[in-house]
């Protein structure tokens, strides 16, 4: 599987680790950057480009990495068609794919050691979307809003 990796300075070391780990596991890994450590770099360009590449390459997935993973997830989710999920456990990584068909995983390098974070990436990449109609319906609701934002019809009880 093709996997796009993007980070900032806080995620640089983990990105380097994941590049090797995922390549060894047989994935075709594309390093979006940064390609050198720069303590002053900003995550948005790397995360936005990672998201853009994932959307433009059906069947691929992405991983964005920062200190907490929060800003990186927010940035990636600004790309139309991206469903980026912040993982903090094996279960959240797995469910993001299984229930939400997430196509970008966000990781906090300051929150997890490299081996734990690699486990999150492994399960994310290995888990297929369930295609359960209720999950598909919810994804379509969000995509519909993305295409035409506006007031929502709220369900009545």
Regions found by a protein language model. Name each.
Residues 25, 79-80, 100:
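Short, structured coil segments at secondary-structure junctions
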């Amino acid at each position: 599987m093709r996997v796009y990796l993007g980070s900032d300075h806080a995620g640089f070391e983990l990105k380097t680790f994941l590049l090797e780990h995922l390549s060894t596991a047989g994935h075709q890994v594309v390093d979006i950057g940064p390609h050198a450590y720069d303590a002053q770099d900003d995550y948005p360009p790397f995360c936005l480009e990672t998201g853009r590449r994932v959307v433009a390459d059906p069947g691929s997935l992405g991983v964005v990495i920062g200190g907490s993973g929060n800003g990186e997830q927010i940035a990636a989710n600004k790309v139309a068609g991206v469903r980026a999920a912040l993982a903090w456990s094996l279960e959240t990584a797995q469910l993001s794919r299984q229930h939400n068909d997430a196509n970008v995983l966000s990781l906090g390098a300051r929150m997890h050691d490299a081996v734990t974070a690699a486990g999150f990436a492994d399960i994310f990449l290995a888990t297929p979307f369930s295609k359960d109609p209720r999950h598909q319906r919810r994804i379509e609701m969000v995509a519909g809003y993305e295409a035409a934002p506006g007031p929502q019809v709220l369900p009545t009880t």
